[in-house]
């Protein structure tokens, strides 16, 4: 990339970008400041209002170009049929070779988002990365992404990496919205990037892996608005999943404890969210309880798909315990035996699980099932998992179906940090609207997944062994065929004798 531009050439470049932007067809995005170089930002502190409808304007999803079939993996691992496909709810699992790392995943997804939206690179004023895939204890992924901004001369970009297991992406999204609704905002867009490679040692946990990245453009007048004041958060100190060994990319996991922590955090966050929305309603003259009926769609962080179905059932159980009216008819019919139970006593209660999984099945099919498409066929993407579910939901519904709805979201990161929050979808689903364009941008998700290469369990295992062999090595060029990557993918070209990483991009 060209490193420097003379002042004259910088001015010419800015003018050219502005002229080209004015000639584009109907813009994908509402206008913030198209170029900070020529349009002075007005500090928010000098205004009397918040920027309107801050949220997600555009999204881009990246996943690896190869996968292993979970049915074949069951046979290869000599486990009973259905352990992965039924027990976990997983059909396929995407994975990365040594050619890809978290930096390359994030480079790819950011470049693809910027190219598709045709935004000037200097229209971004904040970029934050959520990841738990740490390949350097000091140097952030965000600093590598700055390579993409060099030709524009834009180095005035706030934000850095945020890490806590699978929660970093959500923290980054909240930070972007907070920045935009503060006196620090300079009028430009924010980019939120979530990327991870989920890998486990050979054994029971390996089929719950995956890999991918999601980039989100955040700004005002968004089609997916973060509902202000409606975040229920729970945090505590627990060792359910953690990575203390810096010489390995594998975590230490207490699977049973982690599931209990996930469900306990869900209970806590849902209760806090419910309290806040009911308080808002009372201030508006509405005095009634909040339930899942007030959420048209519900997405979850997805370590594996079966846990998500159990989680929606758990939310229904929460509503049931608080229901003050008749619970002997309607959706709660046949559940009265569970009336006297306490949430904290039921995390391992199989009777509760079975009963509410059955009772909530129609609700699951309507509100959540479509959001699991990417997780089913690509696996766990850690920080980007929840937002892959959001993209899947958009890909399976029309703008007209989504318009005006509320999308509930539960984010969880082991250790632990969790939040329940919501998006309000724009009412405008007309052709060319920001919502219609956002939904249309996800329409190729199924086609892209179908275009991947299926790899045998034997080859998959060999590639996992290669990842172990090259992890934290220096002075090497990764093995593999660059042509096996999707066009436009960034990849690791070389690690030199000082551990410095060099990347290249496969031509589009």
Curated annotation (Swiss-Prot):
PTM field: Succinylated. Desuccinylated by SIRT5. Succinylation, at least at Lys-310, inhibits the enzymatic activity.
Out of the domains of life, which is the source?
Eukaryota
Q: Give the record's keywords alphabetically.
A: Acetylation, Cholesterol biosynthesis, Cholesterol metabolism, Lipid biosynthesis, Lipid metabolism, Mitochondrion, Phosphoprotein, Steroid biosynthesis, Steroid metabolism, Sterol biosynthesis, Sterol metabolism, Transferase, Transit peptide
Record Pfam families: HMG_CoA_synt_C (PF08540), HMG_CoA_synt_N (PF01154)
What broad class describes the main subcellular location of this protein? Answer: mitochondrion
The protein's annotated catalytic reaction(s) are:
acetoacetyl-CoA + acetyl-CoA + H2O = (3S)-3-hydroxy-3-methylglutaryl-CoA + CoA + H(+)
Which pathway is recorded for this entry? Answer: Metabolic intermediate biosynthesis; (R)-mevalonate biosynthesis; (R)-mevalonate from acetyl-CoA: step 2/3
- Mention one GO molecular function: identical protein binding
State the function annotated in the UniProt record.
Catalyzes the first irreversible step in ketogenesis, condensing acetyl-CoA to acetoacetyl-CoA to form HMG-CoA, which is converted by HMG-CoA reductase (HMGCR) into mevalonate.
Record's protein name:
Hydroxymethylglutaryl-CoA synthase, mitochondrial
